[in-house]
Each structure stands twice: as C-alpha cells, then as structure tokens.
Amino acid sequence: MLLWAVMLRCVEPIATIAAALSFKDPFVCPLHKQHAADAAKRRLAAASLSDHCAVYNAVKGWEAAVRSGGGAGDRYVHDNFLSRATLQMLQSMRRQFIDILCSAGFLPPSPAGGAPGAIMLGGSAANENSSQEDVVKAVVAAGLYPNVIAVRKHGGRPSSRPPRLSVRGIGRVELHPKSALAGMTALLQPYMVYHTLVRSSACFVHDATCVPMMALVLFGGKLVAQQAGAGGAVTLTLDGWLTVHVAADSAACVMALTQRMQHCLQAKFTTPALDVYAPSPPVSARVAQSNLPHRYGDSGFAAISRETLQLLRCSFSLARAAAAVTHGSATTEDAGSCSDDDSRATTAHLQPVQGFVTRTFQIGGGGGGSDAMDALNE
C-alpha cells in the first residue's frame, strides 16, 4: 500500500491509514453516547464513503487543532470521541513508515527544520494527490485487495433499506454498527474493500471503503483480456472471477497502464537512486500513433500518477452519474460471478471511458478490435 502511495503521490494519508490498520483506529465509544460517537465518525467520513478516510480526517483535524493552540486539541478530541493516546501512537507509527521509505530511497530525505505540520509528511511532491479522495481510496483498494465486498442494491427504485453485501467464499455480510457506512442506503459504487471481518451472530465488516470497479481492475490481481465478440468488445477478468466488458481500445489502455506501473516499480527496486518524481518526457508521436502497450516505456511515475488520477476521476463520475439517473442498479448476488444485468450495468458505466482514455493515454486507432487484442496479447 505504501509503495502505491509513493507512485500515486498520496503518502501522508496512506501512511496514516496504514498505521491505523497496523494498530487500531482512534475512535472511542463511551457508554450511553453511542449515537453521538457514531454521528461524529460519520461527520469525519464526510462524503468519502470510507471508514479509512475518516481515520485520516480525524488525525489531520486533530493536528490542525493542536497547532492552533488554546486547548483546541483537547476540545477536538472530546467533541469527536477520539483517543489522544491512539492519535499520538498513529503519529509515531506514521513517522516511522515515512522514515523507512526515505531510507529505502522511495522518498527524498525529510526536510530539516520548519514548523511542525508546515510540510506534509514525505514532502509536497509525494503528496500532490493527497487531497484527491478518489486516488487515496484506490490505493486503499490496492492494499486491501482481495478483501472485496460486492454491493447489491434492491431493484430499480430508491430503497430505504441498505443494500445487500456479499464476500466471495463467505456469502452475505453486514457492516458493523461502528462503521461510518452502516445503515447507508446510497452506496454509489458496486464494490467495497475491507480490512477486518468478524464472525459472531453474523459476519460483520468493521471497516470499509467504497471503490469503483476501475480501482480493482488497476490495482487488483492478475488481469486477463479476452475478445468478447464482434465489434471489438473485450472482457477483462480479474483473478478469474470479477469481469467487466469494455471497448478494445479501453482495454488496451488499462493493460498498458498496469504494465507500466509494474515496470516502474521494478525499475525503482533495481535502481534505488531513480528519481520517481522527475518530470516525465512528452509522449512521442510514434508512441501516440501506436496501440502497443509496451511502447510506453518513455513515460515514468509522473505520467502514471497523472493518467491514473484522470481515469479514476472518470470512473467515479460515471458511477455517480449512473446512480443519479437510475437510482441504483443490481450488482452481484454472489461476489464470485456476475449476472447478465450486472454485466450490462457495468458495461454501461464504462463504455463512455473509451473516448476518454483514447485521448488521455494518447492511444490512436479507430476501434480496430483485432489490432488492440494483438497488443494486449504481446
């Protein structure tokens, strides 16, 4: 998770979330104040639909309150039902994670001096996308995969009931009441990722983050592309169970980007002195006219970060638009397979990405499915 954060430039929030996953979250729930504590956590989660983002928002808000002085830090802890000792531990663990990344050459040395909090941990370049929740949540998905929850909404009309949730190999699960997402009826994304699942009277997920299909495709497991039929359509299959249908050019773009991510990480491991934040050269005219993914070798971390952000933004906006129009569509009953309705809904969400990614990744071609498939199979 931390290495993806370095690549996608959101080091401070991911280091904070990683610390909480390694230790515990800072929220407390006093007796007879459960409702107030739950409301405070939902307030910190805001519109992120993420328990993990709520943790980062809590730590960031507390640090800002402490810097303002006048006892604001103590008031913040009290008003938001937080543990000061846990917040301090998360601070310390996060600092250790950053120091390890610096020692390994993945981050530049920490700047000396300066007021505490004046510079985000890891430096400004390493946190260029730290305010982009779409990117932060995608990195959380990368770290927590394959802990994936499928979200199934009730019919085609808005419902007052929370959607049904299922995990592959386990079946139906429920969000624990302590989750900021518990009881929500409008989860815009068809999938969530989680860290802790506990079996008691039912299977309860204690912490979850809503993520789009594209985040799982980009940061999940093994991705296989297969020709889906006439017209250049391609089926992308993730780890043999999660499928999505896209246009051939879109599939070529996704496969190219995932390959470049792996190549850049391998290059960094091989050459620790490599500057991962050096500006990327412009894509050459030769590459811009080619569908071959492996010819993207002249684009480094900076281009990958920029292009991933654009693709994730598009994926999130498409899901939001679809939710606004349809008020929800069915997803998988069992996370191990996709129904016909699910496939059509997913295709409808992602087909508009074809033109977007063709422009964003500068892949030429006018819908030649066979050429794109040849590129994917190389």
Model regions: which residues?
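Second RecA-like catalytic domain
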Residues: 1-255, 259, 263
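A positional "C-terminalness" feature that preferentially activates on distal terminal regions of long
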Residues: 244-378
